[in-house]
Regions:
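Acidic-basic catalytic patches of nuclease active cores, encompassing PD-(D/E)XK
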Residues: 30-69
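Active-site beta-strand-loop-beta-strand hairpin of nuclease catalytic cores
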Residues: 78-95
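Catalytic cores of nucleic-acid endonucleases
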Residues: 93-151
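A detector of short terminal or domain-flanking linear segments
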Residues: 1-25
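Short beta-strand or tight-loop elements
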Residues: 3, 64, 78-80
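Charged, structured surface patches that assemble and position nucleic-acid processing machinery
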Residues: 38-42, 46-49, 127, 148-175
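Acidic-and-aromatic substrate-binding clefts and catalytic sites of carbohydrate-active enzymes
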Residues: 69-75, 137-140
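Alpha-helical scaffolding within the catalytic cores
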Residues: 76-78, 149
């Protein structure tokens, strides 16, 4: 239970990451906001906590907004969603879904491509992980991660690892 957001993931409905929300939360006229959520930023922050807990159970303690120097000709600090100096790990978390009509969320794929670019620019020696929500398209059952890897493989730097979190089983899906 995350009391600050009044979300209970043990009672989450299948394929609904937000879980139970407070009765005082009302749905505003925001067509691109996740149903039942206070805001999309809350959904992302909650998903980061899920990732932190997953890695902590495996002995990797991560910090939020982990800053690393990245760049091509010059270096500038970039904050990854999660990271650690010992062991050297950086993680980007994405809780994106297929659109309601089972179409590709193309703007979200651009954000994934941006994450790949930052992984490419990150210092050598860091383990690079994209931690994503497992979401299957209703039409053919393809997961969003499988689609991304099939379509954008040319953007994925060597060595990037993918973890696909199934919110129903609360486990990583084998890709």
């Amino acid at each position: 239970m995350l009391p600050q957001y009044d979300l209970d993931y043990k009672r989450a409905k299948p394929n609904r990451f937000v879980g139970r929300t407070s009765k005082s939360v009302t749905r505003t006229n925001k067509p691109n906001q996740r149903l039942g959520s206070i805001s999309n930023s809350h959904v992302g922050a909650d998903f980061e906590l899920v990732a932190m807990k997953f890695f902590r159970r495996r002995g990797i303690k991560l910090s939020r907004n982990f800053a690393v120097e990245v760049g091509v000709s010059q270096k500038k600090r970039h904050c990854f969603d999660l990271g650690s100096v010992n062991p050297k790990v950086i993680v980007e978390c994405k809780s994106h879904r297929w659109t309601a009509g089972a179409n590709v969320p193309s703007a979200k794929m651009t954000v994934w491509n941006e994450a790949m670019y930052y992984f490419h620019l990150a210092p050598k020696g860091f383990r690079k992980i994209l931690f994503v929500l497992h979401d299957r398209r209703s039409r053919d059952g393809e997961s969003l991660l499988s689609y991304y890897k099939r379509t954008y493989s040319h953007f994925i730097p060597t060595g990037v690892e993918f973890f696909e979190w199934d919110e129903t089983t609360r486990k990583i899906v084998k890709v």
